[in-house]
Amino acid sequence: MKFDRRITDEIYTSDTVRLGENAFQAMQETIYHNGGVGTITGYYDAELSILSVSDLLLHNLNHSYASLMEQTKGSLKNLFYKKDATFLDNAHFRQIKGEGEGRILTADGSPVYVRLYKEDVVDTNGTPICIMSV
């Protein structure tokens, strides 16, 4: 008897087409380095807008996609615990690559410590995006 140990995960986004193949390859890379419990992608705009979030991350934070987007106002800046969010300054955040630690907020607002792994790619329009396994 064989068991399929692969875990499948849904990716929620407002624009699937924009992620592109290189984004999915970068997601695999971040998961490889972090053992990934979920992924989240975002843009390097003023608000660090959330592009996509995996179902597994939503589950671990006790969120639905709608509730996460409402709580964070669609911004990575509002996902992280404010006292730990100094690295989310746009210029600094662009320079970060690889692994780190931080605290993100669950649905009830409680901060939880997480390991992060961040990679940068571009979407299908050539716009830079970040991909993190959390």
Stretches with model-predicted labels:
Residues 49-51, 58-78, 85-86:
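PAS and related sensory helical modules
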Residues 41, 53, 57-58, 76, ...:
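Structured N-terminal alpha/beta-domain signature
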Residues 15, 35, 62-63, 70-73, ...:
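Short, flexible coil/linker elements and helix-boundary hinge sites characteristic
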